[in-house]
From Swiss-Prot:
It comes from the Bacteria. HAMAP family: UPF0301 (MF_00758). Gene3D superfamilies: VC0467-like. InterPro entries: AlgH-like. This is UPF0301 protein Sala_0165. It holds the Pfam family DUF179. Signal peptide: none annotated. Belongs to the UPF0301 (AlgH) family. It comes from Sphingopyxis alaskensis (strain DSM 13593 / LMG 18877 / RB2256). GO terms for cellular component: cytosol.
Length: 187
């Protein structure tokens, strides 16, 4: 019998109803790393109201050709001023890290400059902050039915409108999110 732990790097975490933390209601989190040392993920379903990628580049003094009116996402409650770019594998500049052979994550100004100049990855999204778990914490939340794990598709990650990502991710996993409940029953 294989007793090796299951790690969720490269998967999507979907918050279940009644997760118990309002910051994570309807969250979709792209897992960047998960191992015996803990876990880190970036939220991809909660745009920060009024904040666009173009505005962030303007704040950083990075020129850009296009308006770049894509939203910036609340990546999580940890280090909310730290930026991350989750992107396709067709760009691998300074500090780009491959995540489970699926997508990449970068946090340097190099990728922001590349996006501003129109030479960045073909698919990307920008987030501020991240969700982090200490060793064993995420596993404990899984036991308490806080999260559902699913592979999720690149189309879900990059093309689905943020307001639909949570429900669409469940649908991809074969689950009708409208039928999820916080109530349990007895048999």
């Amino acid at each position: 019998m294989d007793t090796a732990p299951t790690w969720f790097t490269g998967q999507l975490l979907l918050a279940l109803p009644g997760i118990g933390d309002p910051r994570f209601e309807h969250s979709v989190i792209a897992m960047i790393s998960h191992d015996e040392d803990g876990a880190m993920g970036i939220g991809i379903a909660d745009p920060i109201e009024g904040m666009t990628v173009g505005a962030v580049l303007d704040q950083l003094g990075i020129e850009h050709e296009a308006p770049l009116d894509q939203p910036v996402y609340l990546g999580g409650p940890v280090e909310p001023s730290r930026g991350f770019v989750l992107h396709s594998r067709d760009w691998g500049g300074e500090g780009a890290v491959l995540v489970a052979d699926r997508w990449m994550v970068s946090s340097s100004h190099d990728i922001l400059r590349a996006i501003g100049e129109g030479r960045g990855p073909s698919r990307w999204l920008v987030a501020l902050g991240y969700a982090g778990w200490s060793p064993g914490q995420l596993e404990g939340e899984m036991v308490r039915h806080g999260w559902h794990v699913t592979p999720g598709s690149d189309a879900l990650l990059f093309d689905t409108p943020p307001a639909r990502r949570w429900q669409a991710a469940f649908a991809e996993a074969g689950v009708d999110a409208r039928l999820l409940t916080t109530k349990g029953g007895e048999a």
